Amino acid sequence: MFEKITEQPSLYDRLEEKSTREILEDINREDRKVAEAVSRTIPMIERLVEQIVPRMEQGGRLFYMGAGTSGRLGVLDASEIPPTFGMPPTFVIGLIAGGDRALRNPVEKAEDNTERGWEELLSHGVNSSDTVIGIAASGTTPYVIGALREARRHGILTGCICSNIGSPLAAEADYPIEVIVGPEYVTGSSRMKSGTAQKMILNMISTSIMIRLGRVKGNRMVNMQLSNNKLIDRGTRMLMSEFDLSYEDARTLLLRHGSVRIASESMKQKPPKK
């Protein structure tokens, strides 16, 4: 019988009687277990990423799907891809049960609709070159399960991130990632360790894909969008370091070309000074 580790009683009790320091130390003690749990899933993450990269090289997209905290984390990771790596917002798409309103407020029973997730994928023109990753700590969210089931039936690559073993969601995924973090500090509050594990794994998936797709040079975000002064300053210093330019010359070069990568390529194409 399927057992929800995410619903098991906390290892701690009488929380209301603890001091602030005790609560913080307890939570930190539990959080230290998360990185260890994630490290055990690296082979699972690797297998999924190795399948995603060639699809995205051919123009495929990546969809994240979730409800509540899981959905918000998927939207968060997807929203960071354009500014960090200079990719269009349609390259990685985060979908949350209940739509954008659910990012700030709970939408009653949105996650219980088995058909809605697939309908939303269809509205984005999902096809067999794309990948759908379902995110659900429990592994039982109908919105996500229904979407993955239909995606898989239509020949679309599927993966999932969940915090229980042998969940219904994992059964619908080609490449399940089961990250077992144990009972939550507040019983059943999967926004805590499970959510932290999801965020770490999403970071690993998207960052490794972008590196494999050539969106990072050395260790630098050479394709980042220059959307604020901090990023313009960062890009300027990248060019200063690479080409021994003054700050003003590097900044002028960067703003002329609009990206570190293009500015760098323009410098390399210049004939050497005689």
UniProtKB/Swiss-Prot annotation:
SUPFAM superfamilies cross-referenced by the UniProt entry: SIS domain
GO process annotations (BP): amino sugar catabolic process; N-acetylmuramic acid catabolic process; peptidoglycan turnover
CDD domains in UniProt: SIS_Etherase
GO molecular function, one term: carbohydrate derivative binding
Transit peptide keyword on record: no
Claim: Repressor is one of the keywords in the record: no
InterPro entries xrefs: Etherase_MurQ (IPR005488), Glucokinase_regulatory_CS (IPR005486), MURQ/GCKR (IPR040190), SIS_dom (IPR001347), SIS_dom_sf (IPR046348)
SIS domain mapped to chain residues: 52-215
Miscellaneous comment: A lyase-type mechanism (elimination/hydration) is suggested for the cleavage of the lactyl ether bond of MurNAc 6-phosphate, with the formation of an alpha,beta-unsaturated aldehyde intermediate with (E)-stereochemistry, followed by the syn addition of water to give product.
Functional description taken from the UniProt entry: Specifically catalyzes the cleavage of the D-lactyl ether substituent of MurNAc 6-phosphate, producing GlcNAc 6-phosphate and D-lactate.
Stated family: Belongs to the GCKR-like family. MurNAc-6-P etherase subfamily.
PANTHER family according to UniProt: GLUCOKINASE REGULATORY PROTEIN
Matching HAMAP family: MurQ (MF_00068)
Name assigned to this protein: N-acetylmuramic acid 6-phosphate etherase
